Design a protein with these regions (language model features):
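Generic detector of short, locally flexible boundary/turn motifs and exposed helical patches
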Residues: 22-26, 68, 77-84
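N-terminal compositionally biased, intrinsically disordered segments and leader/signal-like regions
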Residues: 6-7, 14, 26, 52, ...
Length: 119
């Protein structure tokens, strides 16, 4: 299957010092995953690009439609910025998910250039 849909899970996001230098969390908007439009399709590709980041990018998914509370989301992939603070990479995520989103936790420095979802 060729990929024909690309959605932005998290647009360009720069660390904004909250005044005390403390890390914080950024949560992107939920986007329909492959199963939302394509029924039993279960392969999604996540592309991400970061520059000089300290923090973790977590990809989450849900089976709820719509997901109305945080405990309906579960982690399906985690990128550790401490291991590779300047990266552009992709990973395949398999699952019959309805929605997916990206979040950055312990965000202390740098730039998330993008996090994209394709299927």
């Amino acid at each position: 299957m060729s990929q024909s849909t690309t959605l932005i899970l998290l647009p360009q996001t720069a660390y904004q010092n909250p005044g005390n230098g403390a890390p914080y969390t950024v949560v992107g908007n939920a986007q329909p995953a492959a199963a939302y439009y394509l029924g039993n399709r279960d392969l999604q590709t996540v592309n991400l690009s970061v520059t000089n980041i300290i923090g973790n990018v977590i990809i989450q998914a849900t089976l709820a439609n719509p997901a109305t509370v945080d405990n309906q989301w579960f982690d399906v992939y985690e990128f550790n910025g401490s291991d590779n603070p300047n990266a552009t990479q992709y990973t395949n995520v398999t699952g019959n998910f309805v929605y997916m989103r990206a979040k950055v936790v312990d965000f202390q420095q740098g730039l998330v250039n993008y996090v994209k979802l394709s299927y």
